[in-house]
């Protein structure tokens, strides 16, 4: 056999092996079919614009992916790196210093009424950090089972902590697996500071993400990233305990959400909808093939800056974007303080600041 024929045979065998792998190799995911609604165009309430092109970057020091951002009563700024460190900045954005180290993955950050920083840590559970940086574990399980991947949280006026478990199957480093599988592996929980117990509020969420309690404390919002929507769970009144869709068919993946304490919820769309993902969501077999591809060949999130504000009825009242994302990209959380927005990100090493005036 000539050298050329041998090479052709070798290439053919390699191609056949690759096809067999893509078609038949076992996977961790067990996807189900879902037909997503057609993505809304970037017109009308989502009209494309470049208002976020002037975001100011505030360096936290050496580190990556400060997903959430929180401010204490003195205006100091906090962000959590992916290696467990939570950094603090002065109110003017200067003097980064280590505030605490969870040795986990701090994702959700919010201050309670006593100025303790409450943390949803994907690896360590629900934590409380006092102003001196001392860490206390509030909870690591609910309903007799340890937490999966905790994601975000908010604290109600009565001290109840509402928080999400993004997935009880996949760790945060494999969050794309949960999105590809598209099973309702997430839930919303509540921690009672009086009993020190956690309980499940809502199950069956497709990648449970951001959490925000309404200004009047009558409901809590939870982002369902896998279905491009925000859910509302009533906490009081005649519909107490019931859930409903608050806003549906978003133009991007909803990540963090926060209340401004008055009349708005700020919602971070971490990246626009992915056309390839929307095309394969109805086809579990194709999603298994994508899962088997090397990471560098799998669909990637688009670098984009996208934040909207919703009123208490779920209507879009603010629309801030930057398609170039030259200043700041992949905004994962947004907090308003005195007419200024502060951003966390899964694609940056800094937090962001933007004046609304």
Where are these regions (language model features)?
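Sequence-structural signature of mature extracellular/luminal beta-sheet repeat domains
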Residues: 2-357
């Amino acid at each position: 056999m000539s050298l050329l024929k041998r090479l052709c045979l070798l290439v053919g065998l390699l191609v056949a092996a690759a096809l067999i792998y893509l078609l038949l190799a076992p996977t961790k995911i067990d996807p189900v079919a879902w037909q997503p609604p057609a993505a809304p165009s970037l017109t009308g309430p989502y009209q494309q614009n470049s208002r976020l092109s002037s975001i100011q970057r505030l360096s936290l020091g050496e580190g990556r992916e400060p997903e959430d951002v929180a401010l204490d009563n003195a205006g100091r700024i906090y962000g959590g790196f992916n290696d467990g460190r939570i950094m603090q900045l002065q109110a003017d954005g200067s003097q980064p210093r280590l505030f605490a180290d969870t040795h986990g993955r701090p994702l959700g950050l919010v201050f309670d009424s006593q100025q303790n920083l409450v943390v949803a840590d994907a690896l360590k559970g629900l934590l409380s950090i006092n102003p001196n940086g001392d860490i206390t574990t509030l909870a690591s399980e609910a309903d007799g089972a340890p937490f999966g991947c905790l994601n975000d949280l908010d604290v109600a006026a009565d001290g109840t902590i509402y928080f999400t478990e993004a997935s009880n199957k996949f760790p945060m480093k494999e969050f794309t697996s949960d999105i590809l599988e598209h099973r309702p592996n997430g839930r919303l929980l509540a921690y009672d500071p009086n009993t020190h117990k956690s309980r499940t509020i809502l199950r069956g969420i497709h990648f449970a993400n951001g959490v925000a309690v309404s200004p009047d404390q009558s409901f809590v919002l939870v982002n369902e990233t896998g279905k491009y929507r925000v859910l509302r769970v009533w906490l009081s009144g005649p519909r107490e305990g019931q859930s409903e869709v608050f806003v549906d068919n978003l133009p991007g993946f909803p990540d963090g959400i926060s209340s401004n304490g008055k009349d708005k919820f700020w919602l971070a769309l971490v990246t626009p909808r992915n056309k390839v993902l929307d095309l394969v969501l109805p086809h579990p077999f194709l999603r298994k093939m994508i899962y088997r591809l090397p990471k560098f060949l799998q669909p990637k999130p688009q670098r984009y800056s996208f934040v909207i504000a919703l009123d208490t009825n779920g209507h879009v009242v603010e629309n801030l974007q930057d398609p170039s994302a030259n200043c700041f990209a992949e905004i994962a959380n947004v907090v308003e303080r005195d007419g200024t927005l502060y951003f966390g990100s899964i694609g940056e090493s800094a937090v962001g600041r933007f004046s609304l005036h």
